[in-house]
């Protein structure tokens, strides 16, 4: 067991690492960011948001935020998309894809299907050299140096970066 002081210090360290991840995103804001926001603000259809694993959970949160602020949005799980759910996408929709690696098998199968539809694709990705980043119209860089978890395993800072 840890002492209360040790627990407090761990908490401060975790929050500091999360803060560093957000600062890195601030440094990464570029023209793609501005163009992606402009595209979202001018969409006449839905904003379709998708991801795999923890990125899918963040995608659902983003959809909830869009809907609560008046932007029509729907969640489409990337695994379900390649098994028939692509039917929810209309020609006037835009698609936001979230992925830490940008290299998951589901994303690699999904991207050609989405590109063939002609919708604008926004990647929120932690690897700007990834397959996803190279296929998207706009790339929002959510690269983080380390996760805030002690073993650098749980997607803590990377999911915070995606949500911001």
Q: Where are these predicted regions, by residue range?
A:
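Glycine-rich phosphate-binding loops that contact phosphosugars or nucleotide phosphates
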Residues: 45-52, 56-164
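An N-terminal, well-structured beta->alpha segment
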Residues: 1-45
């Amino acid at each position: 067991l840890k002492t209360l002081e040790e627990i407090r210090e761990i908490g401060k360290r975790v929050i500091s690492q999360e803060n560093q991840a957000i600062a890195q995103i601030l440094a990464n804001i570029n023209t793609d960011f501005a163009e992606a926001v402009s595209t979202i603000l001018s969409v006449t259809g839905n904003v379709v948001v998708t991801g795999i694993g923890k990125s899918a959970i963040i995608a659902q949160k983003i959809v909830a935020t869009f809907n609560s602020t008046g932007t029509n949005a729907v969640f489409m799980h990337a695994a379900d998309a390649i098994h028939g759910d692509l039917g929810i996408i209309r020609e006037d929709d835009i698609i936001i894809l979230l992925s830490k690696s940008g290299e998951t098998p589901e994303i690699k199968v999904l991207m050609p299907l989405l590109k063939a539809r002609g919708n604008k694709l926004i990647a929120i990705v932690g690897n700007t050299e990834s397959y996803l980043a190279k296929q998207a119209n706009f790339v929002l860089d959510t690269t983080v140096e380390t996760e805030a978890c002690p073993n650098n395993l749980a997607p803590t800072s990377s999911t915070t970066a995606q949500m911001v």
